[in-house]
Amino acid sequence: MDARAINSREKADLKYPRNTYIIGDVQGCYRELQELLELIQFDSTKDRLGFVGDLVNRGPNSLEVLRFLKSLSSPLIVLGNHDLYLLILGYGLMPEDSYEHTLHAVLQAPDKLELLEWLRHCPLIRYEKSLSAVLVHAGLPPQWNIKESILHAEEISTALKGPHYLAFLKNLFGNEPSQWKEDLEGQDRLRYICNAFTRMRFCDAKGHLDLESEGKTNQAPSRFRPWFEWRNPQEDNVDIVFGHWAALNGQSSAPHTHALDTGCAWGYKLTAINLKTKERFSVPWQSALRM
């Protein structure tokens, strides 16, 4: 099922989809994405797709992934740190050779600006009330409830969609401030919010971020834990669906949290979850198809 198949159909009204499937970090693995859609028997006229960010980079086909997702009818998409990195590169705010990446085809594409425009209008959080679920790339820090998280994510959306988005993106990278304070202002405030939603793995009970550690949950530095171990599922009363942390291999120890990054771009698999039934589907990395 490719983008042409989607485009050839009349886009359906998906207000009441048959199924809603959320897919983990695609990271440019277009062929695996298509294999996964075949596995779940995705029907664009009846089903809805969602993605927990990191749509691009590391895998070989980021351009094809973006074009395909843009063709979908009302997909549920949140941004990840690699997607923000593409925006920074795409708008010329950082030299293309600053870091190793696989985004060259996107950066040279004739529809680059159209794709970037579409991407920066995607949010950092999606709350699906009908399914009692929140989509976010990295996670939700413990000091914010669901409502507060949504409001803070909207601050980033406002910056990305506003007239000064280039200045916001240019100064986005950095690990500080790592501690949330209500009186944070300007770029410091936005950087913390963005890091929490797109880069966080370990934090302390007050939302102090450790952005250096990337290992398994038992490798947390002193006083830090995986963000989901601090949250109160009774207070949240929703399912939190996230990606970003490939070392978890799709496993989360906390109730009502669903980890979907199963390391496809690292040679493992791409995973989807049916939000209604919680059934999971996975396809392996197609190494034989790599160029």
UniProtKB/Swiss-Prot annotation:
Gene3D superfamilies cross-referenced by the UniProt entry: 3.60.21.10
Domain of life: Bacteria
Enzyme class: hydrolase
Gene Ontology molecular-function annotations: bis(5'-nucleosyl)-tetraphosphatase (symmetrical) activity
Disulfide bonds: none
Name under which the protein is recorded: Bis(5'-nucleosyl)-tetraphosphatase, symmetrical
Keywords linked to the UniProt accession: Hydrolase
Catalysed reactions listed for this entry: P(1),P(4)-bis(5'-adenosyl) tetraphosphate + H2O = 2 ADP + 2 H(+)
Entry-linked NCBIfam families: apaH, PRK00166.1
CDD domains for the chain: MPP_ApaH
